[in-house]
């Protein structure tokens, strides 16, 4: 099917309440650039998942080095080795999670190693929506796992080092730019 809008994934055949079948761009539900058809209610939609899709393409920067995702007991103090240039510390009633450079983690710590970190370039207002969805959706479609860390200004995607090439391919195919490879 020829695309009627930016992504053929948004075009679906629908059947109206009167039984007429036609193609409809689902972006028309929230994007004013697309016409809203039909005037009658849709009673069946073949496969469309009602979701908001960000229409912005983003730039991600692959940071140097490998990272680890570590788990310590909930009551453990924050260790000194978790204070590198890039690190994230999250405490919950169940655990203390630390994301940091793989080189900083001492032996004997429960962790998963071999992660690469992609930083979302720029600063984003906390009220912006669809940013992570536009980045994670192509990875989910490609069956690629990730771990996300957010800060006040931006987000970081951690992906397995063995999947980095596939992640870059999925993101660039979706229209995003990946630098620092």
Locations of regions flagged by a protein language model:
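Regulatory modules associated with amino-acid/nitrogen control
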Residues: 51-138, 166-181
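Short, flexible segments with low predicted structural confidence
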Residues: 16, 110-112, 142-143
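Cysteine-centered metal-binding/redox modules
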Residues: 1-51
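Short beta-strand micro-motifs in enzyme catalytic cores
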Residues: 21-23, 41, 68, 96, ...
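A structural feature that tracks compact, well-ordered secondary-structure segments
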Residues: 129-162
